[in-house]
Amino acid sequence: MKLSKKYTFRSRKVLLIILDGVGYSPKGPESGNAIAGAKLPFLNRVWNQFPTLHIQAHGKAVGMPSDDDMGNSEVGHNVLGSGRIFDQGAKLVSNSIASGDIFNGQAWKEVIGNSKKNNSTLHLLGLFSDGNVHSHIDHTKALISQAILEKVPKIRLHILLDGRDVPEKSALDYLNPFETWLDSLRKSGTDIRIASGGGRMTITMDRYEADWSMVERGWKVHVKGEGRYFSSAKEAIETFRSENPKIIDQYLPSFVISDNGKPVGKIQDGDSVVFTNFRGDRAIEISLAFTEKNFDKFDRGPLPNVLYAGIMQYDGDLKLPERFLVAPPAIDRTLGEYMASSNIPQYALSETQKYGHVTYFWNGNKSGYFDQNSEEYREILSDVIPFDQSPEMKALLITEALEKALNENKQDFYRVNYANGDMVGHTGNYLATVQAMEFLDGCVERLWKTCEKQNIVLLVTADHGNADEMFQLDKKGNVEKDSHGNPIPKTSHTLNPVPISILDPENKIRFNSKLSNPGLANVAATILDVMGYETPEGYHPSLIQNES
C-alpha cells in the first residue's frame, strides 16, 4: 500500500473496537434503551467529549434490499472490512427469484430432477420468518410454488422458529396463515406438509462450532424423525408454551410431526434437500452434516444419500455446499487483503460467537489467513449458556488478551468485537443487557489507557443496533405492553445508526462532520487514513477531516 502524502500527524497504529449491537437512539431507558439505562461513565464521556459521528448501519447502506431492513453482524462486518457496499444475500435471492434466474440455474434443475427421477421428497429446511437476516419466508414460498409447477411428487418442510430477528413470540403469526396456504395447496392435490421443527437457538443453527449438540438435535428430528411427536406444528408450539409460559420462540424444543405414530417427513435416500437460509454463519454446520464424508462431530447414523443444496453457497473457500441456487456476493479487495499483501501486521480477536465476524466476514467471506506471517487471529471460547445468565460473557478475557497484545506492540492494526450488546440483547432481557453494557464500559476504558500509553489511535464503533431498543415500539414510537402492562421485549436488531468515535492520544485527529450520509463503508478508509496510507480505488471516503 502507498503512504499518503496528505498528512503528517498519523500514529500509523490503530485499534478498532466493534461493540456489537450497540446502536444510537435518542430515546431513554423508558423506551427500552439499555444503553441509556446503563451507567457508562467512560463511554458517555467518549460519545460526548471525543469526536463522534452517527453512521448508517442498516438497509441500503449495508447492501440490504431496502431501508426497512435491519443491519446485521454479517453484512456489517462485510462492509466494515471491504470499504464498499455489496448487494447481500437477502437482495441477491429476492432479485434472482423475481427474474426467474434461480429456477433456470443448473442447481435448481438438479434438485427438481432428482426428486422427479426418484419419485422422492423435496425437503426445504430453514429459518421460518420474514426477518430477512438469515432467511425470508417469501423465498421459501417461491421455492414451493415453483416446485409445484414442476410437479415435484412430495414436499416436506422443516421449520426453524425465529423469535430473534422478529418478535419473540410471533411463531404462530407466521405459521397460521402459512398452514392455511398449505391446506389450499393440498386441496389442489399437492402432497405438502410441515415435518419437523424447533427454536433456532435449540436446534440446527449453531455457528462457529460453539455447540454441535444443537445441530445433532436438529439432525435427529429433520433426518431421523426422532423426537417428541405432534399432529401439527401449531400443536407443538402451543403445548410448549403451556408447559413453559415464559419460553420464547428461539428456545422452543424440537418436534416431529407424525401420522398414525410415524413421522411424516424423514429425510431418506434419493430425496432432495434445500437449506433456505441465505446467510452463511448458521448454515455451515448443518451443511457439513449433510455433505461431509469424514464427519466426526456427532453420530449421524446411516447417512441418507440425498442431493443437498443451499439457497446460497455459505463458504466459497470450502466450496460449501458445492451445489447452490444463487451465487453469493463476490467481495474482493478487502482491507485485510490489502494489508496482508503489504505485510502490514494485523491482529483480530473475539470470542466464539463473533470470532468469524472479525475474520471470515471481515475478510469478504473468506476462510483462513491471507498471510499467516503478518496476521494473528485469536478466539476465546464462548460459554454454552443463555447469555443473559452471564452478561459479561468473555469480555474480561478479551480485554486482558488485547491489553497484552497492545503492550507487545507487534501489530499496526488491531480489531476486536465485543459480542455482549448483541448476544445479550437477543435474549430480550433488558436488565441483563444493562449489566452487559456496564461491564463493557470498564473494558473499553482499560483499552483506551493502554492505547494512550502506546500512542495507538482508538476507533470505537458498532456493526448495527440492538441494545438501544429492547422494547417493542409501535409506529408512533410508544412502548407496546402485554396484557399485564409490562413492556413487550424486543429481541431483534434495530434500524438506528451506530456511533463512531475517535480517541487520539495526541488529540489531533478530527472527523469531517460535513460528509454526506456516512455509513459503515467509510470506516475502512478511515482506518487507512489514520495509519497514513492511501485509500484504495472504489472505497468509500474516509471520515477524517483533511488537514488545513
From Swiss-Prot:
EC numbers for this chain: 5.4.2.12
Binding site for substrate: 134, 164-165, 200, 207, 279-282, 354
CC cofactor: Mn(2+)
Keyword rRNA-binding in record: no
Pathway(s) this gene product operates in, as recorded in its UniProt entry: Carbohydrate degradation; glycolysis; pyruvate from D-glyceraldehyde 3-phosphate: step 3/5
Residues that hold Mn(2+) 1 according to the record: 422, 426, 493
Xref: SUPFAM superfamilies: 2,3-Bisphosphoglycerate-independent phosphoglycerate mutase, substrate-binding domain, Alkaline phosphatase-like
One example of a Gene Ontology biological process annotation: glucose catabolic process
A single cellular component GO annotation: cytoplasm
A Pfam cross-reference name: iPGM_N
Catalytic activity annotation: (2R)-2-phosphoglycerate = (2R)-3-phosphoglycerate
Active site: 73 (phosphoserine intermediate)
Cofactor info, note text: Binds 2 manganese ions per subunit.
Any one Gene Ontology molecular-function term assigned to this protein's record: phosphoglycerate mutase activity
EC class name: isomerase
Residues reported in the UniProt entry to bind Mn(2+) 2: 20, 73, 463-464
Keywords, in A-Z order: Glycolysis, Isomerase, Manganese, Metal-binding
Function summary: Catalyzes the interconversion of 2-phosphoglycerate and 3-phosphoglycerate.
Protein family (similarity comment): Belongs to the BPG-independent phosphoglycerate mutase family.
Subunit structure, as described in the record: Monomer.
This protein's name: Probable 2,3-bisphosphoglycerate-independent phosphoglycerate mutase
Organism: Leptospira interrogans serogroup Icterohaemorrhagiae serovar Lai (strain 56601)
Higher taxonomy: Bacteria, Pseudomonadati, Spirochaetota, Spirochaetia, Leptospirales
